[in-house]
């Protein structure tokens, strides 16, 4: 099914999909968009990379179009700042021919004051991580009284990361809520709990992952000791002449320590873990 067949969607939104290079809808988009346009609660299971942002973005924008930028009409919750930023950018791209639409993205690791100014300037859509959204609500920078639509993206990951109470608290604040949609790669017990508590006759969408041939990846196991691990790792990188290497550690402390040790051996190293600020991550 092509996007141009969505007769209930504003031409400006369809024009944006064309400008973004989209013609044919993915399975999740074809199934979810009509349900959300009709205002159904929904649990959608679909693999990452299947176009879920467009699947919920088009209905959100369709409902928000025509409203002035003020108190938000829709909230999209994301488990991480990086995903929140990507969602906000995708929604902004979908709204490129709707100049009245404002999307504000709020997340931890960045200054509250700048985000508060953006919220107070007004918007129709807020994309947020749960903790930072609650921060702004407690500081009276965010009016949730007019939110009719809430979407939990990567709901399983978000709830498994410990945001269960925050998510419930946020939903409880939405007195004008008309629909709750959850998009998730898996349906965990926590996702089902949220659905049971807050959804009514929810539509269920299940998109199966495409079975692809296994990538050609060679796997090796090297037995070493704690004392020799650094030397063995360095020797492997040098002997194989690897140009790009990704190393995973089991703790944030070990990640930073290993990065420092490799840097002292004159490797060009970047370190990434959850305790880094947004500026350090960038």
Summary of predicted features, one role per range:
Residues 2-282:
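Conserved helicase RecA-like core
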